[in-house]
Amino acid sequence: MANLDTQFQEFYGELQITVTKKQALITSHNNLRTKIQKYFAKNHPEYVPSFYIQGSYKMGTTIRTRDDECDLDDGCYFIPKPEVKGITLQNWVMDAVNGTVGATPVHKNKCIRVNYAAGYHIDLPVYRKERCNDNTEHPELAVRDGEYELSDPREIVQWFNSKKKDNPVLIRLVSYLKSWCDTVRGFMPPGLAMTILASKYQKKHEGRDDIALRDTLKSIRTALQANFSCVVPGTPYDDLFESYDSNRQEKFMSELNGFIEDADRAVNEKNKLKASKLWKKHLGNRFHLAPDENDAEMSKLDKLRDIGNKVLTGIATTAHNGYIHAAEGVKNVSHRNYGNE
């Protein structure tokens, strides 16, 4: 089995946001917070916004896409509840961020998205809540095409934090799966779905991220074959796959099967270059090709198997120094140790 753990560790590094972009992202999100606070202080002083970073950035699973883009979710909370419609609250936040230098705000259904020319975007979902320190009360998310709906992103973060505790490989597995979805795109599930599936069905293999990923993919497939669903572990506990029609479901499962087939071939391939090409096919161009060489451990195993076969067939010889399967030496006695009958 070609051990490509080194290539996987390098690949994980390639998926990380650069220091420069991370600094720009944080600076931009701080500037947006300031703009929103100033807007409400001037135009709606009865409402004071507070903020909470959520989503993949909070969980530590953000990746750079193949287009070198990334994002950050910054929840905008109003406590106590403003007695206005959800779209009104969204419109006010939209007004607050309009005119941001180097950026274009977009009013989406469940957030205000600020797209930056520098290659990242910041989502501003808007919430309201009656009491600040009441953990039994779930926030209400403003929806453009509706009113409000219960949504508690903190529960998702807390759930994932419990899964990743003393389990750093989980973050890497989530990143690999998100890169797979980013490579294929189209009908593939969102990053949150892959985060949930990896967390629920993770398989571990110490020191071998390639095997851990292969086995986790198989575990996910088994679960989805039994029940094609992905329930969010937080209020409102919705199923991310509920809207998938049979065509999209079949396409995703076909892609999953193809990935597993190639992952099996890669793990069992002794040539590192050939194995890395199989992984690269699904994980994208940032997965580095390995040297064109056979795995040392697999070569040793092949030699041992060869010696074993010659011992079993009675054609092995032993050299004067004790090495079996020498070019010259004393012919071995036929093997008769077949265990207890």
Swiss-Prot record:
Keyword GTP-binding attached: yes
GO BP annotations listed: defense response to virus; nucleotide metabolic process
Residues where ATP 1 binds: S56, L192, D238
InterPro entries with a match to the protein in the record: DncV-like_NTFase, GAMP_synthase
Binding locations of Mg(2+): D73, D123
Residues at the site labelled Important for nucleotide discrimination: Q54
Keywords: Antiviral defense, ATP-binding, GTP-binding, Magnesium, Metal-binding, Nucleotide metabolism, Nucleotide-binding, Nucleotidyltransferase, Transferase
Active site: D71, D73, D123
GO molecular function: 3',3'-cyclic GMP-AMP synthase activity; ATP binding; GTP binding; metal ion binding
Cofactor binding comment, as recorded: Binds 1 Mg(2+) ion per subunit.
Substrates-to-products reaction catalysed: GTP + ATP = 3',3'-cGAMP + 2 diphosphate
Cofactor: Mg(2+)
Role according to the record: Cyclic nucleotide synthase (second messenger synthase) of a CBASS antivirus system. CBASS (cyclic oligonucleotide-based antiphage signaling system) provides immunity against bacteriophage. The CD-NTase protein synthesizes cyclic nucleotides in response to infection; these serve as specific second messenger signals. The signals activate a diverse range of effectors, leading to bacterial cell death and thus abortive phage infection. A type II-A(GA) CBASS system.
Record's protein name: Cyclic GMP-AMP synthase
Gene behind the chain: cdnB
